[in-house]
A protein has these predicted regions:
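Residue-level recognition of transmembrane alpha-helices
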Residues: 11, 15, 42-45, 84, ...
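Alpha-helical transmembrane segments of multi-pass membrane proteins
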Residues: 54, 93, 100-132
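Membrane-water interface segments that mark the loop-to-transmembrane alpha-helix transition
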Residues: 6-18, 44, 49, 53-103, ...
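Helix-loop interface residues and adjacent transmembrane-helix termini in multi-pass membrane transporters
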Residues: 32-35, 107, 134-135, 162-163, ...
Length: 243
């Protein structure tokens, strides 16, 4: 079977699972947590989502394109990976600092849930899916995602039992993102030459900033469109309507 067919198969299975699992969790969470608590979750997640955007910028698209273009040259690909990821670390750390400032200075309620949503930004800090997308290794990313998704569903069913467990639900979802991305680092030495990190310098990082930002602008518009409704409902209406 060709690589293209295998990748298509992995993606198809993942999409089916991605569609099926919410059919299990959504009715359960609606009954156990209720609309108000789910509204709190949606609102705080939407706020954290803006900081995830700041952390990632256009790295997923730009990183995938760059790696795909030079994947036949392992030396160049390895160097590019560490340069792009170094930039990603900087933007993610900046985003985390700003989010902490938001929690301290602006956030007046649901602080614990908001803090736990912050793990989504940590997840963005260690998100190197774009490396594996670039080398067309969908088996690693899809298999890992499926295992994590099934695990989170099991944990939700076992641990989330009442509206007071909103923080547990939030922790499961956000920590799942961190764990899912952290697992990928085990496979990095199998894809790139780790010694290439020694060749990374400021000039090498700077050359990736402009093309990254170019791809970020349309992504920003699309992403804000998808999460703005939850933010506006949470800010101007009730959490119950947001949920």
């Amino acid at each position: 079977m060709s690589t293209l067919k295998k990748n298509l198969g992995y993606q198809t299975v993942y999409q089916i699972l991605n569609t099926a699992l919410p059919l299990i969790t959504s009715p359960y969470l609606a009954r156990v947590l209720g609309a108000t608590k789910l509204g709190v979750f949606s609102y705080t997640q939407s706020i954290a989502g803006y900081f995830v955007l700041l952390a990632a910028l256009g790295t997923v698209n730009y990183g995938t394109r760059t790696i795909a273009a030079i994947k036949s040259n392992k030396t160049e690909m390895s160097k590019a990976f560490f340069e792009i990821y170094s930039f990603q670390i900087l933007t993610s750390l900046l985003s985390i600092l700003v989010y902490v400032a938001y929690i301290v200075l602006v956030c007046k309620e649901n602080i614990l849930v908001a803090l736990l949503q912050g793990f989504l930004i940590v997840g963005s800090l260690i998100d190197i899916n774009w490396l594996f997308f670039g080398v067309e290794n969908f088996k690693v990313t899809v298999t890992r995602n499926m295992v994590i998704r099934v695990t989170t569903v099991v944990l939700i069913l076992l641990l989330v039992k009442s509206p007071n467990d909103l923080w547990i639900y939030t922790l499961i979802m956000s920590a799942g993102t961190v764990l899912s991305n952290a697992v990928l680092f085990y496979f990095v030495p199998k894809v790139v030459d780790v010694s290439a990190i020694k060749k990374v310098n400021v000039e090498g990082i700077k050359k990736h900033i402009k093309p990254n930002l170019v791809l970020f602008i349309p992504l920003l518009a699309m992403s804000v469109y998808h999460i703005m409704d939850k933010t506006m409902l949470g800010a101007l209406s009730t959490y119950e309507q947001t949920g």
